[in-house]
């Protein structure tokens, strides 16, 4: 009897091992099939990306003359880009008082994708003759490399004699005395371009993204921002007055 039980136990163990081997084989087969499906999806995604790029390239060509026409009209509006820049909720805080003096000479802004779109883009600020620097335009270029990194280059600013990066601005304190508070100039966005390892690079890249994807696409939204805010504030005041009236009525009812 003992021998029979031992023999039976070995048979059961062998059967379990065969079942495990079968399960393992089925699992491997399922994973292989899943990988094949994922490979098919990857091919479709790559094809879709290529076609999206082709469409983007096509419409970049179509947009170009429209952007040129828009630029012509913008140049007839004094201080357009400075106003749009200052009215932007994120970009407006980046300009020091000294930067704003320079921005008065900004007469056009241009964002241009690389011809194949995927290689990168450039942002160019065009200035009229000014007392700060010699350059008629300042360009910052973002080149997307194959290894996944981004190469950033920018126009070295040729400051005029006695001029340079605005490092601070005078503020009046409570005693009426002026004191210098350090503020980073927006123009460090150009001068820091070569220092990719610098901790500020993420902020600078974010600035480029905002200019490219938001400000450039519809600057009129921000140029008109002050008027919109006034309208909005007016509505808020009306709502607050209405709420106060309601509160007064409730208090009177309570007293009765």
Curated annotation (Swiss-Prot):
Domains: entry comment: The acidic domain is probably involved in the interaction with histones.
Secretion signal, residue range per the UniProt entry: none
Any one Gene Ontology molecular-function term assigned to this protein's record: histone binding
Coiled-coil intervals: 23-64
Subunit structure: Can form homomeric and heteromeric protein complexes with NRP2. Binds histones H2A and H2B and associates with chromatin in vivo.
Name of the protein this chain belongs to: NAP1-related protein 1
Record's function text: Acts as a histone H2A/H2B chaperone in nucleosome assembly, playing a critical role for the correct expression of genes involved in root proliferation and patterning. Required with NRP2 for the maintenance of cell proliferation and differentiation in postembryonic root growth. Involved in both intramolecular and intermolecular somatic homologous recombination.
Main localization category: cytoplasm
One of the Pfam families matching this protein, by short name: NAP
Any Gene Ontology biological process: double-strand break repair via homologous recombination
Similarity-based family: Belongs to the nucleosome assembly protein (NAP) family.
UniProt subcellular location: Cytoplasm; Nucleus
Disulphide bond pairs: none
Disruption outcome: No visible phenotype.
Tissues showing expression: Ubiquitous.
GO cellular component, one term: nucleus
Keyword flag Iron-sulfur: no
Protein's organism: Arabidopsis thaliana (Mouse-ear cress)
